[in-house]
């Protein structure tokens, strides 16, 4: 975080709301706030990272009927090219999204559950978060490419709105 009154206020607000199960609008626009939560209590909280959310949303979309998570802005070109909101916009697919105020806590709860299912009872949620992060630009992008052709966008100056 850059030292500023605004960032200090955001951190105080985030910490005061963290244990309530709900976060005010806009608090997850800064992934560093979820990093703070994960550092404070890695048993309960995971980093709400754009790559991890991207992977999780694709898996939820492809294999379940579960509501998707709010997708934070990222800086990865491969994920930008495969913007799921654009995909949904130009199709008949209209997914439901979780409410932003509870999305972070539901994400952390799901990662806690999945970590135990995949790695055993003592596993921490960050293990699943790192797995999701790691497969975003490899397995997830390749899986999407099998279903949808994104090659036309790869060599152009493509910017999402």
Regions found by a protein language model. Give the residues of each.
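Helix-hairpin-helix
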Residues: 18-41
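Short, surface-exposed helix-loop/turn micro-motifs enriched in polar/charged residues
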Residues: 24-28, 44-48, 120, 124
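C-terminal accessory module of base-excision DNA glycosylases/AP lyases that mediates lesion recognition
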Residues: 50-54, 63-161
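Long, highly charged, low-complexity intrinsically disordered interaction regions
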Residues: 1-22
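Short, flexible loop/turn elements at secondary-structure junctions
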Residues: 1, 40-41, 132
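Catalytic Zn2+-binding segment of zinc metalloproteases
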Residues: 38-51, 59-64
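Generic structural hydrophobic/aromatic packing signal, biased to beta-strands
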Residues: 10-15, 36, 111, 128
